[in-house]
Swiss-Prot record:
Gene3D superfamilies attached to this UniProt entry: 6.10.140.370, Classic Zinc Finger (3.30.160.60)
GO biological process: cellular response to zinc ion starvation; positive regulation of transcription by RNA polymerase II; regulation of transcription by RNA polymerase II
Effect on the protein of changing residue 203 to S: In ZAP1-1up; interferes with the zinc-dependent repression of the ZRT1 promoter but does not prevent full induction of the ZRT1 gene
Source organism phylogeny: Eukaryota, Fungi, Dikarya, Ascomycota, Saccharomycotina
Keyword set, alphabetical order: DNA-binding, Metal-binding, Nucleus, Phosphoprotein, Repeat, Transcription, Transcription regulation, Zinc, Zinc-finger
DNA-binding region (UniProt annotation): 705-846
SUPFAM superfamilies per the UniProt record, alphabetical: beta-beta-alpha zinc fingers (SSF57667)
UniProt biased composition (Low complexity): 17-26, 442-456, 545-555
Protein's organism: Saccharomyces cerevisiae (strain ATCC 204508 / S288c) (Baker's yeast)
Record's protein name: Zinc-responsive transcriptional regulator ZAP1
Bias type Polar residues, positions: 147-158
Span list, region Zinc-responsive domain 2 (ZRD(AD2)): 579-641
Residue span of region Zinc-responsive domain 1 (ZRD(AD1)): 182-502
Region (Disordered): 1-26, 140-164, 436-482, 510-555
Gene name linked to the record: ZAP1
Length: 880
């Protein structure tokens, strides 16, 4: 993904503060309730671009004259304790019901990002210093002239400098880094002085390779230098803003005024090459329009014609069938499908937008257009939240590199590739659960059978990475291909290195070959002789003709998307840490719903459930959920007690017979795939279909298992033989305490029988299978508890409050809330607890005496605490 390119050239408001003030004056009670609402949107992965867009809804009282409030509004306000408990809660991967929530919000704002893959022609607007060093002085030629937002016509030629300035500032937000930013760069690193957040998105799209990449793929193993150059990511600098007021002129509209997408009325002031690029944006016809509860006005839309091309209609059919974001069905008004207007109305705030004061009748249309303002504070906040959501699933939940052996190796401090994930990518992103068409497990024993024709494209599962920096770009660190700083070689950049710096063809994919053992990446950048040159002569501020030679003769449109992702989450922010954690006797309070979920996963799940293949019970107040593994308990916390983040894919191919299911993609990224594989080894049905287009071989149990007990290293043919060996040889009797000597374990148990049960975690021996879902378990007791999740049986009843539970231990802990019994005591301070997990967490507070009041993390060093407080302050930016 090279550079962020504006989908439109919209009218800009003075600032987000102005918009916020307008909304506050229009609805004074709306913003006093608290900052809460819903974010939902799409990620469209095309062959040559990724388009991310969506809506943000703030909770606000709905006028009785326009619509009636729904009972679900109370559930949104109480999202901290039970996210959308009024029938709208759902498991990840289940049907989303955001359509029921969108009706509750009259405040709707639009966000969008457009990222191109491997388009060198889009990188020439990236660097202001580079332009000025070439004596173009763009900053002096561009003038920010306020335009009348009510005027439907503007002088297109005179407005061109300002439009060009908008493109320039929009593109400046995304800069391709000249060198890879390491996940943990050392102090004084020339790459960046901060540690950027990493957003990693899975992708199975086919990205055409250049001839240089094809030749490189046929060559020998690349050098370390090639690997380092391969690490160029998209770097987003949040301190660069587009503050220019734009005229009421929209390039996108210039190419949507025809009855089809094949013919365009080009503006004479824009060259054909750039016109082709902008016209192709009309191929993305997903408006993601929320039908607000307004009175329909047919007169407002009587002059519009609706058009749909073949490609967009296919995408919309899938969208309407599997996505509920934009559909709203009521008794009085049928569901409105996606409509693509032949021409848009003037770029004014929609009648139901937060940027316009609502009237008593809220006259409007069913397809009120949202203001398309790119790269605002809210846009960057949304992208930052995606990174923060990704960080929720770091180790121990997201051992992303180890378990499926991506070829996305991390880089060490010296820039060389490492073979593990300790210094590499440390995040597991929930977006990875959304895209299909990838193997559930690597075939490490296969051979490389690629033909010459297959090397021109890469169909393998790979990742796109986005680096999120909270500062301005450090231009002193821009280094050209010869290793010379760009800040000190202005003349050389003007004549020679400018082509290298700007016209370089960047590649941000991480390719992985499924048919051969893990190896170093084979994709490199183009050589200098293959790069397209950019003219170095002076350009007039209103003339694009001199750029025509530098643009490709034909820019391919975004075609045949196979990865349309739907995502949503809810947010809630409180100033006084009013969101209480209701985990058993947890005294913590959080300022936002995101912080609450982060606290639950990091301070409770990671500490209470250190053995993810054992049954896990949720310890939230009045919650009796029993999970099968770490995946289930994490998803339960997300849906019922957290931000309710959900992500689904609306892929036409994914719903065809023989396509790879979402469960298979889950196996690719699951930190404990063994929990899903044992059932297959014991005869459970295989998810792989005989008609599978990818011809994935069935997952097989390892031929031999090795005993790792205190250096034993004996091999066995099955998990049962290993388990019998452990019980017969290594477990003695008659001890007062038993210790597990398995590699890196060393847990102690008061009874031998408990150690025997624990050993099955290491041996993977699970002889008990559920007849309903074919899952396997290590003990009969665990199987009985699991079957109650299917039957709904709760045989254990509290004799005081008559509450029922599925397992006896949950009832035992619950009764302590009535009796006040706290049998567990801290040996350091004497504080008592009613549950062992709370005691374990409390003991850690003695080991780390410095505690952050924002995120509840503890540290043993005061300097680390101060650094964490600064980080928390940056992450707690408001949406407005």
């Amino acid at each position: 993904m090279d550079a962020l390119t504006p989908r439109d050239s919209p009218k800009r408001d003075d600032s987000m503060a102005t918009s916020a003030a307008t909304a506050a004056s229009a609805k004074p009670d709306a913003l006093t309730i608290g900052k809460e609402g819903i974010v939902h949107g799409h990620i469209h992965n095309y062959n040559n671009l990724t388009y991310i867009h969506g809506h943000l809804h703030h909770s606000a009282p709905v006028n009785d004259s326009s619509a009636s409030a729904t009972p679900a509004a109370a559930a949104v306000a109480d999202a901290a304790t039970s996210a959308f408990a009024s029938g709208a809660s759902h498991d990840m991967g289940g049907d989303c019901h955001v359509n029921e929530k969108c009706k509750e919000y009259t405040d709707c704002q639009h966000f969008e990002f457009l990222n191109y893959h491997n388009n060198p022609s889009l990188t020439k607007y990236n660097d202001t210093a580079t332009y000025n060093s070439n004596n173009h002085s763009f900053a002096n030629n561009f003038h920010s002239v306020a335009s009348d937002p009510t005027s439907p016509q503007q002088n297109s030629k005179s407005d061109l400098p300002r439009r060009k300035d908008s493109w320039f500032n929009d593109d400046l937000i995304l800069l391709p880094s000249s060198k890879k930013n390491k996940p943990n760069p050392p102090p004084g690193s020339d790459d960046c002085y901060c540690t950027p957040k990493i957003l990693e998105i899975c992708c199975d799209e086919t990205h055409p390779k250049s001839e240089a990449n094809i030749k490189q793929g046929e060559s020998d193993q690349p050098t370390k230098k090639d690997i380092s150059e391969n690490g160029n990511d998209v770097a987003i600098f949040t301190d660069v803003k587009n503050d220019h007021l734009m005229p009421n002129f929209n390039l996108h509209d210039q190419y949507c005024n025809s009855t089809n997408h094949d013919s365009h009325n080009h503006n004479n002031t824009v060259p054909d090459s750039f016109s082709q690029l902008m016209s192709h944006l009309s191929e993305i016809d997903c408006d993601l329009t929320c039908d607000t509860p307004c009175t329909a006005s047919t007169s407002a839309t009587s002059g519009h014609k609706f058009v749909q091309d073949h490609q967009s209609s296919n995408n919309d059919d899938v969208f309407h069938k599997y996505c509920k974001f934009c559909e709203e069905s009521t008794d009085n008004q049928p569901c409105s499908k996606h409509m693509h207007l032949e021409s848009k109305p003037p770029q004014l705030p929609p009648k139901c937008s937060s940027l316009r004061k609502p009237t008593n009748t809220l006259q409007g249309t069913n397809h009120a257009y949202h203001e398309h303002i790119l790269n605002t504070d809210m846009d960057l906040k949304i992208l930052e939240d995606l990174c923060n959501i990704s960080s929720l699933y770091e180790v121990p939940f997201g051992k992303h590199i180890n378990h499926h052996d991506h070829n996305n190796a991390g880089n060490g401090c010296d820039g060389s590739s490492t073979g593990n994930n300790e210094n590499g990518n440390q995040t597991m992103n929930l977006l990875l659960s959304s895209i299909n068409r990838c193997n559930p497990k690597n075939n490490l024993n296969g051979s490389n059978n690629n033909t010459a024709g297959a090397t021109s494209t890469d169909h393998q599962h790979h990742h796109h990475r986005i680096q999120f920096h909270s500062h301005k770009p450090n231009r002193n660190n821009i280094v050209n291909n010869s290793g010379i700083s760009a800040a000190n070689t202005t003349a050389d950049l003007t004549n020679n290195d400018l082509n290298d710096l700007i016209s370089r063809e960047y590649s941000y994919e991480r390719f992985r070959n499924q048919s051969e053992p893990p190896s170093l990446p084979k994709v490199t950048h183009q050589n200098q002789k293959n790069r397209r040159s950019w003219p170095t002569k002076d350009l007039e501020s209103t003339d694009f003709s001199s750029l025509e030679d530098s643009l490709p003769s034909s820019i391919s449109p975004p075609i045949q998307t196979t990865s349309t992702i739907n995502f949503n989450w809810c947010f809630k922010e409180e100033k006084n840490n009013d969101l209480k954690c209701k985990w058993k006797e947890c005294p913590e309070s959080c300022s936002s719903l995101f912080d609450l979920q982060r606290h639950l996963l990091k301070d409770h799940v990671s500490q209470d459930f250190k053995h993810p293949m054992e049954p896990l019970a949720c310890n939230w107040e009045d919650c009796d959920f029993l999970g099968d593994d770490t995946c289930s308990i994490v998803n339960h916390i997300n849906c019922q007690h957290g931000i309710n983040f959900d992500i689904q894919f609306a892929n036409p191919d994914s719903f065809l017979p023989g396509s790879i299911s979402k469960e298979k993609h889950h196996l690719l990224h699951c930190p404990n795939p063994q929990t899903h594989e044992v059932s297959k080894a014991d005869g459970a049905p295989d998810m792989t279909s005989a008609n599978d287009v990818s011809n994935i071989p069935p997952i097989k149990q390892p031929e031999q298992v090795i005993c790792q007990w205190d250096g034993c290293n004996k091999s066995f043919s099955s998990a049962q033989e290993l388990n019998d060996h452990l019980e017969a040889v290594h477990l003695t009797r008659g001890k007062s305490e038993y210790q597990c000597l398995w590699h890196d374990c060393h847990r102690t148990f008061p009874q031998r029988q408990k150690l025997i049960r624990h050993l099955k975690v290491h041996s993977k021996y699970k002889p008990y299978k559920c007849k309903t879902c074919k899952r396997c378990f290590s003990s009969e007791e665990t199987l009985v508890q699991h079957t109650r999740t299917h039957s709904g049986e709760k045989p254990y009843k509290c004799h005081i409050c008559n509450k029922k539970f599925a397992i006896s231990s949950s009832l035992k802990i619950h009764i302590r809330t009535h009796t006040g019994e706290k049998p567990l005591q801290c040996k350091i301070c004497g504080k008592r607890f009613n549950e062992s997990s709370n005691l374990s967490k409390h003991i850690k507070t003695h080991q780390k005496k410095y505690k952050c009041s924002d995120c509840s993390k503890s540290f043993d060093d005061l300097g680390k605490l101060n650094s964490q407080k600064v980080k928390c302050a940056l992450e707690r930016k408001p949406y407005l």
